[in-house]
């Protein structure tokens, strides 16, 4: 037995952005918390260059695949029960915004964190590869 078990329920082929397909995510019934992850490095890049299954992401956002991802697009995916919160079903939810060290404009993180706070969505910004404070 263990105190904490992390299970990847929905891969993105190393792309920083995606929306779940019909059959995703596969969250184990014993899970009591879901952590959704989005990489900040998607912001400002074209959907076709940064998203896993770009046609699905573009359709979800109501955009073309050659349009850039905005912080508001990321927020739409985070807050949606068809996006990052799909399958949460009453479990605790945390949005982890990764690669904060890649942000050219730190106001983007501040805007997203403010939206999360206003909406009661627990969110953390950070970088799993580098110290953000260095």
Regions found by a protein language model. Give the residues of each.
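Canonical P-loop GTPase G-domain recognition
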Residues: 106-134
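Short coil/turn segments at beta-strand junctions that form active-site/ligand-binding loops
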Residues: 3, 32, 91-92, 121
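Phosphate/Mg2+-binding loops and adjacent switch elements
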Residues: 1-86
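G-domain G4 guanine-recognition motif of GTPases
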Residues: 39-40, 60-65, 80, 92-105, ...
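A short acidic (Asp/Glu
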Residues: 17-18, 105-107
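A structural motif corresponding to the C-terminal end of an alpha-helix
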Residues: 80-93, 119
